[in-house]
């Protein structure tokens, strides 16, 4: 991930169990005992995320929610229908861990998943066509506040559909990511939808459209598992503070 290259209230959200003890005027402090038990490792020992237990901590509307223990965070963000939930499930080897929404654009919460050494944070999808002006403004504030102020954020995985050129919303997100100064890794999803010979062509076209070097972009498929181990390895390295 390359920095900048893409280019407290007491409210609570959905958790594995109800969150109690929130204090008005202060951020939530969420401990590991508030979620369901850790889900045990998946079947692929070559994937560094499959050999670690993972726990859903909760869904929260406040970008300053405080978690205990405090660990580095890697955020996943992308357009609605980019395949973010499916990719997350395959990355960690836990089918059904992240719910694939039947109502894209409706989720406005930050979903936190804890691994032993860091959190994965599933940010709401952007660019849903039927979202009103107020919803878009609220989304922008939520994500902008998280990107700019979250002290534990170690990096962002930015998902784009390999079949399409960057949209206006994608370019706006690229600007927000660049302004945040956070390390960003661009990841192309749904590679199984193209022929093998078309993949390098699209990698070149999209890298050029985004102003990125091709080695700053990874190709993945939740269906064929293309690039999954490589992406998991990059995420673990970024959470450890390595430049990937």
Show which residues each predicted segment covers.
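Switch II of P-loop NTPase G domains
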Residues: 66-68, 102-111, 124-154, 162-176
């Amino acid at each position: 991930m390359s920095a900048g290259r893409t280019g407290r209230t007491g409210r609570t959200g959905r958790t594995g169990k109800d969150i109690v003890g929130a204090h008005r005027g202060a951020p939530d402090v969420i401990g590991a005992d508030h979620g369901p038990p850790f889900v045990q490792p998946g079947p692929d020992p070559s994937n560094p995320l499959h050999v670690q237990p993972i726990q859903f901590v909760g869904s929260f509307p406040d970008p300053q929610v405080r978690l205990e223990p405090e660990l580095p965070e890697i955020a996943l963000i992308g357009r609605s229908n980019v395949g973010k939930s499916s990719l997350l499930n395959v990355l960690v080897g836990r089918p059904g861990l992240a719910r694939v929404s039947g109502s894209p654009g409706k989720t406005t919460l930050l979903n936190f998943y804890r691994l032993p050494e860091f959190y994965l944070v599933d940010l709401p999808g952007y660019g849903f066509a039927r979202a009103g002006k107020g919803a878009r403004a609220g989304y922008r504030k939520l994500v902008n506040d998280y990107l700019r102020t979250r002290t534990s954020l170690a990096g962002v995985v930015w998902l784009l559909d390999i079949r399409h050129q960057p949209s206006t919303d994608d370019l706006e997100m690229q600007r927000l990511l660049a302004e945040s100064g956070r390390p960003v890794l661009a990841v192309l999803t749904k590679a199984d939808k193209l022929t093998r010979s078309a993949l390098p062509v699209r990698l070149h076209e999209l890298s050029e459209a985004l102003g990125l070097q091709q080695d700053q972009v990874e190709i993945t498929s939740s269906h064929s598992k293309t690039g999954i181990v490589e992406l998991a390895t990059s995420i673990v390295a970024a959470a450890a503070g390595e430049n990937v």
